[in-house]
Regions:
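Conserved phosphotransfer microenvironments
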Residues: 1, 6-37, 41-49, 56, ...
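In a subset of proteins, long, contiguous C-terminal domains/tails are tracked
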Residues: 199-200, 208
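Non-catalytic signal-transmission and effector/linker regions of two-component phosphorelay proteins
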Residues: 1-3, 52-58, 62-141, 148-149, ...
Length: 208
């Protein structure tokens, strides 16, 4: 199939016949250069042993909510289009910083649903179908970062267009403390943008 036609995204389960899923992802990327390959799993044991990389771009958890499929498509679309849309259309950006696969797999469908509903309400009844589609495409883009370096990279690149940051209290922090990574990121984001809206989420009461 990959050789016969063009694909924009591959979503695969952890088991692809007898082939290892990472080997499958690598093979797919050899057929179509730059093809995003996302793995979807519901097996807790599998999730504990698998990591992104080597053919797999992201890993999501299947919880029974079918909206995760649309959210994966929208996230990959946002990641691919954000640079051009910010440059050409001054589109806004929302940053989600979370390394828990189970949490961001549950969070993203909620976030995208609210974002699309709000955009639809703002459009109202006016305008033709073409105008409404253009407005939907101009909705805020959501970017997912799972460690400190990638979060800072998004802030550095799109700080003028970020309208909000949702951050966990703990996540991988290269060269720093994992337990206080969220607070470090908040300080970093507000250094040049004091009033940037940030929602800090943590189960650790000591960080509140």
């Amino acid at each position: 199939l990959l050789s016969a036609r063009e694909f924009d995204l591959v979503i695969t389960m952890a088991r692809v016949g007898e082939m290892d899923v990472k080997a499958f992802g690598t093979e797919a990327k050899l057929v179509i250069e730059g093809l995003p390959v996302v793995m979807l799993s519901h097996n807790t044991r599998e999730l504990a042993t698998l990591s992104a990389g080597d053919g797999i771009d992201r890993i999501f958890v299947w919880t029974g909510d079918s909206r995760i499929l649309l959210s994966i498509c929208k996230l990959i679309e946002d990641e691919r289009n954000v640079e051009n849309d910010v440059r050409d259309g001054d589109v806004q950006v929302i940053l989600l910083v979370e390394d828990s696969r189970r949490f961001y797999s549950a969070y993203l469908p909620l976030l995208y649903t609210q974002l699309v509903n709000q955009t639809t309400r703002l459009m109202g009844e006016g305008g033709n179908l073409h105008e409404k589609l253009l407005r939907l495409r101009a909705r805020a883009k959501i970017l997912l970062a799972s460690d400190m370096n990638s979060a800072k990279s998004v802030i550095d690149r799109y700080h003028n267009n970020i309208i909000g940051i949702f951050t966990d209290g703990k996540f991988p922090n290269q060269g720093g403390q994992r337990d206080t990574a969220g607070l470090e990121l908040v300080r970093y984001a507000q250094e040049g943008h004091r009033y940037m809206p940030i929602l800090f989420q943590s189960k650790n009461l000591e960080l509140k």
